[in-house]
Each structure stands twice: as C-alpha cells, then as structure tokens.
C-alpha cells in the first residue's frame, strides 16, 4: 500500500513538472529576459502609474516575472518563470540575472485576463538573504507589502519601510501594488543552465561576478536607466 501511494505521488509530480514545462514550451531564456525588460520599461514609462523612483533606487534586488499563468495542476493555481537581479557589492550597477520559478499566491487574476506580470522589490539585506535561499514563501518566510504606485508616491510609511519585499502586479493594463502572500519562489536551475552552460546556483550568479548574457545585459541596462544610485 505504501509503495502504491509513493508511485501515485511520483506520477503526480511528474505530471505537474511536465505540464509546467508545457506552459513555456519553446520559449527561450533570452526571449523571457527580453519580455522582462519590456515589462519594466512599460511600467516605468507610465506617467503616474510606475514604481516610485525613490523605492527603485533604494531596492537591493528586483524580481520580474512576466506572464504568470493560471495553472490548475499547480498547488495554488498559478505558475510563472522570471528573473532576479541584485545590485553589485559596490552598490552601483546590477548583477547578471538568475532564474526563478513562482507558484501560488494571488497575482491579480481577479482583474481579468489569463496572464499577469509581477515585480518584487527586495528592500534590505534580510530580504536578500531570504531570496537567496533554496525556497521561500512570501508573507511566511519574508515580510511582504503592496508597494505604492506613482512616480512621486511617498515611500516613507512605516509599513513600506519595514517590509522586506514590496510587490506589484499588472493584468490587462492595470498596474497596482498587491500583497502576494502565499506565493513561493525557488531557483529555476534548468533556465540557469540554459543561460550559463553550467548548473550555477542563484547565489553564485548574483554574488559571484557571473558575466551576463546579451539579453541579461539589456535588462541590466534598463535597470540602470531607471534606478541609478547617485550617492
């Protein structure tokens, strides 16, 4: 009986992995990086609906997950693949991108539409340490809050300053701060291998001076454009 249950679990896990792969079948890491850069540019170009400049400038890392999809076979019903970039040790410039998978959470599908883009700002070292772990859950392993919207919006409330991660989503053109409690993030080792030709960990990529691919360099250039530190 135990063996039968184990076989069932393994089979179910295989179906989930296969189905998740089918959602992104044929899409390369380079194409997804380009889409991530487009998402950032479109959001920041909105006159009164972008992420406040002050927050982006203060952030330690950013997670961009374009096109999160509804997926009934995933626990939590939602699945996405995206990238993390963190500031270099000097505090200026951005690292090569590391790949992540996102599952569960509430990404704004109530607004309508079949896909949602998400952006997460990691605001302090504690949040970065959580981000570099093998897996963590927003709201449980790291404090999270809906980020303020508007290029000149105030970022000085206690809630925003205490949160380790500020989160946003965009669906059907509507961009808003939304608390993504319950969403889990984990490394996407397959995509990292595709980009860099070896099985590097996210920590090695973000903290080890890994050279970015061409598409990764373009995303970093966009981040520098919108979040250059002046100090």
PLM segments and residue spans:
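Bacterial N-terminal signal peptides that target proteins for export
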Residues: 1-13
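Sec/Tat signal peptide C-region and signal peptidase I cleavage site
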Residues: 18-25
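Small-residue-enriched, tightly packed secondary-structure blocks
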Residues: 26-231
